[in-house]
Regions:
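Conserved catalytic alpha/beta core of Sir2/sirtuin-type deacylases, generalized to analogous enzyme cores
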Residues: 2-116
Length: 116
């Protein structure tokens, strides 16, 4: 993959911060961001909101996918939007509140920008 970034210090290929092994970083910054995110969710609990999921697979669905589905089902004003190259889907319970686009995320975003 030609676009993979490399560490400027040691030259090793960089990876995403995923809960797949012992390299996941859950430091002070992670907890600060987590608290801000939870505060945002509480403040917008029953308001009009779009839960936008970009490229989330089934590696750790309990982190993003399942909570988005749950929050959408509990809020009639919510819309669950998923853009994924191969795994764009939602449960039947929230189908009427969902937009699932199975396509390349970059192309979808370029198309949206071109339509403005």
């Amino acid at each position: 993959y030609k676009r993979q970034p490399y560490c400027p210090h040691c030259g090793a290929p960089m990876t995403m911060n995923l809960r797949i092994d012992g390299t996941f970083v859950q430091d002070e910054g992670w907890y600060y961001a987590s608290n801000r995110y939870n505060d945002f969710l509480k403040r917008h609990e029953n308001l009009k909101i779009v839960y936008l999921e970009l490229g989330v697979g089934n590696n750790t669905p309990v982190i993003i996918k399942y909570p988005f589905w749950d929050m959408t089902s509990k809020n009639k004003n919510a819309v669950y939007t998923c853009i994924n190259y191969q795994e764009a889907f939602c449960p039947p319970q929230i189908k009427k509140q969902s937009i699932c686009i199975q396509a390349d995320i970059g192309k979808v975003l370029r198309d949206l920008q071109a339509d403005k």
